[in-house]
């Protein structure tokens, strides 16, 4: 049964225990209105099987799937009852050829820190497993204390992202240019799982700045109409009463994030996505639905920016009285 699950950090699985309803659920209140998503579904897509087994200089065993994706690993595992093992996902090997997560994690000690990892407690029986409540950004998979000989045929990596139709293809005689286009496609796939994220590893946040900068490219390559109708509903739903648009949507509010992030909420280049994305959407698809659906939120956003203007009409995030440019 699943003993721990987190979208970012991973899962802890006790294969010897079965789910039950004997525990006690904590009753909490929820003031929001629950409604169905209007986005396309997130689905499994490309599958990478039979990874290369890498024996690193530090003695660890690593699987190389050959492509950096956002998704999860499907595997088969068997170990003695009570045996514990761990699988950690990462994007690269270091300069010595050893597995590392230092490029994506603040706490890079994968032996003790839960980050893009799955922990197993074995029960003596073989089990097929794939995560239910997490996705990870990775090409490499580190196996720690693995309870049996590593067989590449028992592992496969599956890319998971919103089911969007491809609307662009490109090929040329230049291998480097072809690779750039391919990498751009994987950037779309790796960051468009229900919310447009900055990366599929560390923050995994719906940054408005990233979304509006990449909008034209992403929507040229794939049909993202449903995707952005859903996400702009998130943005408008999170908007503050004074018109401020959070830099990340969905947001955890003022009690979440680093102090540097909180102090910059509503910044130009981020918060104005409330206006720019509906405009880009109309220009790309000839459809004004986002403008109509978000008109009031757009007006509030403009009013917020206007309230922060100084005498020379320069935006000040904190207060027009504090702008050194007036």
Model-derived features: positions:
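Extracellular/oxidizing-compartment recognition motifs
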Residues: 1-201, 210, 226-229, 245-262, ...
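Aromatic- and histidine-enriched alpha-helix N-cap/loop-to-helix transition segments
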Residues: 202-210, 223, 265-273, 293
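Charged, long alpha-helical assembly modules
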Residues: 250-257, 262-286
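N-terminal hydrophobic signal/anchor transmembrane helix of membrane proteins
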Residues: 216-245
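Well-ordered alpha-helical scaffold segments within catalytic/enzyme domains
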Residues: 146, 213-224, 274-290
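Hydrophobic core segments within long, regular secondary-structure runs in both alpha-
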Residues: 178-181, 185, 225-236, 275, ...
């Amino acid at each position: 049964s699943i003993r721990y699950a987190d979208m970012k950090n991973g899962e802890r699985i006790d294969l010897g225990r079965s789910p039950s309803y004997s525990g006690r659920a904590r009753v909490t209140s929820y003031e929001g209105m629950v409604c169905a998503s209007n986005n396309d579904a997130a689905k499994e897509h490309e599958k990478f099987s039979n990874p290369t087994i890498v024996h690193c200089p530090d003695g660890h065993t690593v699987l190389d799937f050959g492509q950096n994706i956002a998704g999860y690993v499907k595997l088969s595992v068997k170990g003695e009852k009570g045996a514990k093992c761990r699988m950690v996902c990462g994007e690269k090997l270091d300069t010595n050829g050893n597995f590392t997560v230092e490029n994506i994690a603040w706490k890079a000690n994968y032996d003790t820190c839960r980050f893009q990892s799955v922990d197993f407690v074995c029960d003596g029986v073989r089990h097929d497993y794939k995560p239910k409540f997490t996705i990870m950004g990775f090409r490499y998979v580190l196996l720690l204390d693995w309870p049996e000989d590593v067989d590449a045929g028992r592992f496969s990596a599956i890319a998971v992202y919103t089911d969007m139709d491809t609307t662009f293809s490109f090929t040329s005689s230049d291998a480097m240019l072809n690779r750039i286009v391919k990498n751009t496609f994987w950037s779309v796939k790796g960051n468009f799982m229900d919310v447009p994220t900055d990366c599929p590893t560390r923050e995994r946040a719906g940054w408005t700045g990233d979304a509006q900068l990449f909008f034209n490219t992403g929507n040229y390559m794939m049909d993202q109409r449903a995707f952005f109708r859903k996400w702009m509903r998130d943005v408008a739903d999170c908007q503050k009463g004074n018109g401020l648009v959070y830099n990340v949507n969905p947001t955890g509010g003022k009690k979440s994030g680093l102090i540097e992030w909180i102090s910059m909420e509503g910044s130009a280049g981020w918060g104005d996505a409330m206006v720019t994305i509906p405009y880009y959407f109309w220009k790309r698809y000839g459809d004004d639905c986002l403008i109509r659906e978000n008109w009031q939120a757009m007006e509030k956003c403009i009013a917020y920016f206007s309230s922060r203007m100084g005498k020379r009409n320069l935006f000040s995030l904190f207060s027009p009285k504090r702008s050194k440019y007036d």
